[in-house]
Amino acid sequence: DFSQGHRIFAYLSKKFSYAKNKLATTVSLTYTGQSGSPVSYVYAGSAMVRDADPSGGLTNDLIYVPTSSDLAGMTFLSNTVNGVTFTPDQQKAALNTFIQNDGYLKTRRGQFAERNGGRTPFTNILDFRIAQDFNIKLGKDRVQFQLVYQIANVGNLINRNWGRNYFAANDQVGLVTFVGYASTTNLTPQYRFNPAFNTNGAFNVSDSPVPNYGSR
């Protein structure tokens, strides 16, 4: 749960002096790159084994990551999301696409996902800073003062999709919903998948540390 992954830090600065060194402007950029937090891919919905019914719609049951041929034999029920109904075949195709586009899940096809095996996306934060120095002579003394303007997460100012920090509630992603078994005598598992995962992603955008740009 507490694996930090990798962290990259870079700093670039340039100072420009002029007006016989009475004035100076310093422009700097700071880059911080951080691996995402560990996450587990679990079933949403009903508990699959003898667990108590889950709270919050998530179980602790790690998902089986199906191969393409596995998907063909799985039972999906129609799923209506925001007024749009997806057929079982549409859900299977969407889940297959999601798995193939996920760097971790595509390596686990035909196996169960591992606890904390996945990660939220890598975070890239770029901060901008400009400092203006003034050297003023007051009588026999020379006084220097500085005005500073900073923009935190300037990438997010340029593009709202840049500089985002992601998280998963309780470090779990309920990727596939386990609806239940066909009947008490037919233990064929039934599932649903929300194709919106392919457009909206599986993670939430965090308010920490710097989800949106800010200046001071």
Model segments located where?
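Short, solvent-exposed micro-motifs at the edges of structured domains
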Residues: 1-216
